[in-house]
């Protein structure tokens, strides 16, 4: 399968996501520059962390107008899986692909630490390998992760079971003392109603190798890779080279789909150093 990693001016976790997809999980991965109008056959799109366009106006407010986001929206509308991590989550909110908004953290401080997450829903392409109620230990690094939604919208989100991850204590109990940013209903991760678009503030790509202090983030990547590995053929009569887009369209209705592999194309940001330390202020 092929991961498409979006890169905006100011992204600094794209290298981390690429490393997880390609080096840790052995999948094809492709950088998608923000000016591109082509997802290049990606089976899954990741919007990584960072400071897209310097976070001017609001986090993600300018990135939503990038040409690549037009393609991402169309891809998501066809059922293609999209994962927004940290700043990527903020971009999904600004783009209207997920409901709600992000505010400054409670206390107005940047939080960089490991948090515990309780898995709430496992019927998404990004949580299917986890167990309901499982507690994951994954790092965060943000200044604007305080999720907000009006009461009516929040009730609809809860009714539709769109909350997939909540901040919790190490035993999985909800306790405001373990909510690092004041997020409404302790929301750490959210999906759309179709369940193919997911946003989360914690960084699973930073928790895929023991060297980095933990591997609980593998549950997120194991889920999407496992979803695509569960079937390895495009629909009857469809050339394999055309399988990626068709399989993405079918994902929401038929989770057992696999994407076509391919060679890595040169990064549009070649020459940039990897940012393994992650986001520094938001």
Predicted regions and their residues:
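Active-site-proximal beta-strand elements of phosphoester/diester hydrolases
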Residues: 3-4, 137-141, 198-201
